């Protein structure tokens, strides 16, 4: 049964998208029943990978409503023509040769088989040239078919056995039994006598044998290569179906649905002929579980008895591989063993790595669930009178890929998954790992002298009857053997698989598996200790943890620490449960919080245990609780704490200038954006939006931009995104425009102007110009005769002229956009004494032929008179002068002499003497 072990962090799951779910892929601890989904009843038509699958074979599960159409087929007396029309048509379309039930009906248990839906599973054998995915799609489209999956190839054993002679050694240490090779079975009792091995790196079997050696009423199904049924060290401990042994050949004498199944069954060829596989793998595995002990030959098995009659567990050979490319159904083998007395299912097999299986195949799931629920039971699920246990326990090797990944079927939560160790406590180099592994046992390591596992071999295959092999395949039967000791010792009416599994997974060596293997939380709870399975539950819970310390809290991480506690009756707890939630945790709601487990074995009471938490949310308050749990599931009670992570401030983006960005065919723009992070985190930069004509490079803490007019005329936007390592983002939008350029030009006159001394006038130059919209202009103003007036002009084109001395001059203007050649114009200027006077000037004096009178510009009409020195009026005339501002008098006919000029207008009266030459 799976437990989730906390590794170096609480994984990304601690992001707490929901606090109301489990971190663990685990079924409730009170039962080994499965929780993993991927149910065949799910309507979604998604298919498992077909890599590593057998060509021309599929498993299907039909709907219960369609079962009547298959009854004739089940009886073996009908062809596909008896099936529903559409199904028959689809089967023919893929070249189907025949169908057969995956789980042949056992009439003794028909009711429970139908209740669990195993009668709905069929194997479809069809043209091997057909594409498997297409065939699955074809069958899944049929209304009667509920689910379809490939039949995966079982990985063939690759390790080669190393045969040995079993001549007793004079230097062999004392052993409790007389099997000559027992002293060399270091995996049972390691004295450290082999080079680089460490004393105690074993399963503690010699001490366990003082309590139990195995009983014949315990049947262990060995789903593996065929066992050598003639092996002298195995033949007396084989399961024997007496009805078939004493019955007629070719007849199902015990009416269990299988013919001639004397020692088990061959699921490759579907007959009772058991033969050793090409590597003697099944024989080696069987020997570890239950080779006859104390019989003065060969080796001993974990639960092989003590040499007395009736001692030793019984080995049921469920052959699922044999020669090269030979494979049978592990699911069918498990189903068979559940119906025929086995209560422990030993499985040192898996699927090829290339199959890339990411979920338990549903046929395997159905068989495993069935074995766990019904092994040792009658048709109603009640314990059989002659069975030592109600329900079964399924044990799988973790696999030999040397990888950290979920290897199915072993990774299915309800089974016990076994990893492998070397003779010095380290993880065997080939062993798979993961938080789905439950426990570790010796599997051997060829890099150590005599460091592999010693067990039985088939002489027919290897030339010798004993030899070494390595693998999780060798570790797994140690655990199955220990489970067999548990059932042998405690088995009775009312003893359950839950109790067995609890004892099995709680029987651990004192060593710290996390520290010794280096794979924290990836090698299971610990190293199995056979001697610890007999401990008594005195109902005493572990001591409560005094305090949960929290240090080094950052935005997403924190460090936890606490002191290891003791357990009064068991010495140490087996694990610590850590709970995490954004809600306050209590004893009542702890089960709803995110939680995980940490191995407790190997941490002496008072030793400081530290644990980093990762993947927390920033600026969030978390509530934590921790408890110690012993092997019996008794808990210390919760110790509470809380923490609040630091607030993460987003990065800062700042533009070098806020001016509007405009580019044309003649212009480009350059600017920069500075980025920083208030929390001193690393910032990553991305630029999106318009890319035509936009180039940039990052230099230090600046993004240097250059804009050119590549995109069509229009308005565009660039977005700069700064992201810190925790994902906080800041976005800066930068608009820019592509426009058509127009050089500035004067399109109207500024006129001529008059200003009084000490007075000023203001002109708006900008409206007289034509230019490109949005282009800024610079202005310059200069008076030709600076003694007469001054001129200033601002950035908006407001020209201010101030009179200094009477006279006429001009103001010169220059306007530039910084792109084209500047444009110029001039403004005629007259400086008068006072601009409110009716006449600004009279000239020339003396006059000869004409006399010019410059009037106030506001004058519309004026009366002009000239008097001689004697007072004679020589001119009296009215002039309309609106808009002209000047009157020219012809005076050439006047006699030379002195005269007086008088001007009368709405602006006032004016008198001036002048001389006519």
What are these regions (language model features)?
Residues 225, 247, 255, 260-366, ...:
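Subtilisin-like peptidase catalytic core
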Residues 573-617:
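Recognizes extended acidic, P/S/T-rich segments that occur
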Residues 28-167:
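Inhibitory N-terminal propeptides of secreted protease zymogens
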Residues 238, 342-347, 357, 390-392, ...:
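C-terminal subdomain of the subtilisin-like protease fold in secreted/lumenal serine endopeptidases
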Residues 5, 835-843, 847-917:
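C-terminal outer-membrane/trafficking sorting elements
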Residues 143-146, 198-271, 284, 288, ...:
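Acidic-leg catalytic submotif of subtilisin-like serine proteases
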Residues 224, 407-488:
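Extracellular S/T/G-rich loop segment that most often corresponds to the catalytic His/Ser-adjacent loop
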